[in-house]
Curated annotation (Swiss-Prot):
SUPFAM superfamilies: Elongation factor Ts (EF-Ts), dimerisation domain, UBA-like. CDD domains: UBA_EF-Ts. Associates with the EF-Tu.GDP complex and induces the exchange of GDP to GTP. It remains bound to the aminoacyl-tRNA.EF-Tu.GTP complex up to the GTP hydrolysis stage on the ribosome. This is Elongation factor Ts. Keywords: Cytoplasm, Elongation factor, Protein biosynthesis. One of its GO terms (cellular component) is cytoplasm. It comes from Clostridioides difficile (strain 630) (Peptoclostridium difficile). The gene is tsf. The keyword Protein biosynthesis applies. Residues 82-85 are annotated as: Involved in Mg(2+) ion dislocation from EF-Tu.
């Protein structure tokens, strides 16, 4: 039997909202596999949220830069150890500079981008090293994304740089309404974090996995086998409307879907508009901050 630690139980509880004993039992049944334990809790109706195991804990900033005609955009995430440093002006300037360099570069990986020359006359990596020495805290240029399109691209920053979203739209229109639409869609993505743009992108593996979980969930609820299939179909349909961007209810107007919003703007500008890609960065996504017991920390300082 796998060794189930208190930390594993704590992580599963935080990611699902289930009770401590339920989390422990699920981990034991899943032999320590965190994702399988999440599925088991969902099947039993004990998970309050279909979150994946793991939590967001790192600090830092996301920044976006865009060219003048909204056909090229870049987005970067740079992490710091504390929120205090994330609010430091030197740190903010570095993140903005990194986004500007990402916008101008043809490089596709961080290592190559860090090797490019900064406006200070040294490499971006050397500038980063200097900031680390000045600020006195570890900084990490974690990732960047770039969108280049013949259509239009819009961006949105939420929470002062905690979440950033880029939205690529396929369209011939050059109208302020299109950019406003792009920002509205980006806000939707920031708030609702959809897995897919449209139902066409949903892969068969996801459908099979969710069908299995929902079927087991219905059976565990004691539903008759003859109506389980119908129930699963209905629940899966509801879930797809939640994970597919275009089928989501628009957060600024719950009377319409995002798909209807896009269609309305397309009609208003007299040109087809298709949302083809979204990129969403959330600061610290998937990174777990190091935690120490306060008593242990004090003990270390006394040694």
């Amino acid at each position: 039997m796998a060794n189930i630690t208190a930390q594993m139980v704590k992580e599963l509880r935080e990611s699902t909202g289930a009770g401590m004993m339920d989390c422990k039992k699920a981990l034991q049944e899943a032999e320590g596999n965190m994702e399988k334990a999440v599925d088991l809790l969902r099947e039993k109706g004990l998970s309050k949220a279909a979150k994946k195991a793991g939590r967001v804990a790192a600090e830092g900033l996301v920044a976006i830069e865009m060219n003048d005609d909204n056909t090229v955009a870049s987005m970067v995430e740079v992490n710091s150890e504390t929120d205090f440093v994330a609010k430091n002006e030197d740190f903010k300037v570095f993140v903005k500079d990194a986004a500007c360099m990402a916008l101008a570069t043809d490089k596709e990986d961080i290592a190559s981008l860090l090797g490019e020359t900064h406006k200070e006359g040294i490499t971006l990596q050397e500038v980063l090293n200097n900031r680390v020495a000045k600020i006195g805290e570890k900084l990490d240029f974690r990732r960047f994304a770039k969108v280049v399109t013949n259509g239009q691209v819009a961006g949105y920053i939420h929470g002062g740089g905690k979440i950033g979203v880029l939205v690529e739209m396929e369209t011939e229109a050059r109208d302020a309404k299109v950019l406003e639409l792009g920002k509205d869609v980006a806000m939707q993505v920031a708030a609702m974090n959809p897995k897919y743009v449209s139902r066409d992108e949903v892969d068969a593996e996801y459908i099979a996995h969710e069908t299995e979980v929902l079927t087991q969930q219905a059976l565990n609820e004691g539903k008759p086998a003859n109506i389980v299939e119908k129930m699963v179909k209905g629940r899966l349909e509801k879930e797809l409307k939640e994970v597919c961007l275009l089928e989501q209810t628009f957060v600024k107007n719950p009377d319409i879907t995002v798909k209807q919003l896009v269609a309305d703007v397309a009609k208003a500008v007299g040109s087809d508009i298709k949302v083809v890609k979204v990129v969403r960065f959330e600061v610290g996504e998937g990174i777990q901050k190091r935690e120490e017991n306060f008593a242990e920390e004090v003990a270390k300082q006394l040694k």
